[in-house]
A protein has these predicted regions:
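Soluble or luminal CAZymes and related metallo-dependent hydrolases
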Residues: 1, 88, 161-165
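Conserved Class I SAM-dependent methyltransferase catalytic core
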Residues: 159-181
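Conserved SAM/SAH cofactor-binding pocket of Class I
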Residues: 39-141
């Protein structure tokens, strides 16, 4: 009865059942994190394809990990590499840690605000991220289930500075990306 009420209120089924599927993974999700999307699976495909047969092991970082879908997939599929993941919220990181454990992979999680990413001081070979990119003014075009239930800070960016997160990630990469990265 409650599930039907939630569906009628446009709550995504993934939040109602508390899980989502991403590649070969089953992930716990809640309204603190975005529901993993097929487009994000394509991002993981590109990284896996590019680094599947690369030696020696690489340090990979997922910036803004959310549910951990990217980091956990990379840890599972690129086993010999070291995967780091960061987000700025304890509850989000706890959920991502649960997902890593549930999927039997080792991911090194850090709590870090993206505005202070450079203070991480971690040399890496691969930077992966699916940062917010939808302009606030585009909210009117979004489906109600997204607007009502998914975390806006993981989707929307300030209209005046839409590339903020990309710039911060690029600044980090310029300082910390290994020459082979």
């Amino acid at each position: 009865k409650r599930a039907v009420k939630n569906l009628l209120a446009q709550k995504p089924i993934q939040y109602i059942i508390g899980k989502s599927f991403f590649r070969s993974l089953t992930l716990n999700v809640n309204e603190n994190v975005l529901i993993p999307r097929p487009e994000t699976e394509e991002l993981v495909d590109w990284v896996v394809e590019d680094f599947r047969n690369i030696y020696p092991k690489k340090n990979i970082i997922d910036v803004g990990t959310g549910s951990g879908c990217i980091a956990i997939s990379l840890a599972k599929e690129l086993k010999r590499n070291i995967v780091y993941a960061l987000d700025n919220d304890d509850a989000i990181l706890e959920l991502a840690k649960q997902n890593a454990k549930k999927n039997n992979v080792q991911v090194n999680f850090f709590k870090k605000d993206i505005n202070f990413l450079n203070s991480l001081n971690l040399k890496i070979d691969v930077v992966v991220s699916n940062p917010p990119y939808v302009l606030n003014k585009e909210k009117k075009n979004m489906k109600l289930n997204v607007l009502k239930h998914e975390p806006h800070e993981a989707i929307f960016v300030n209209d005046e500075d839409p590339l903020k997160f990309y710039r911060l990630i690029l600044d980090y990469a310029k300082l910390n990306l290994e020459k082979s990265g």
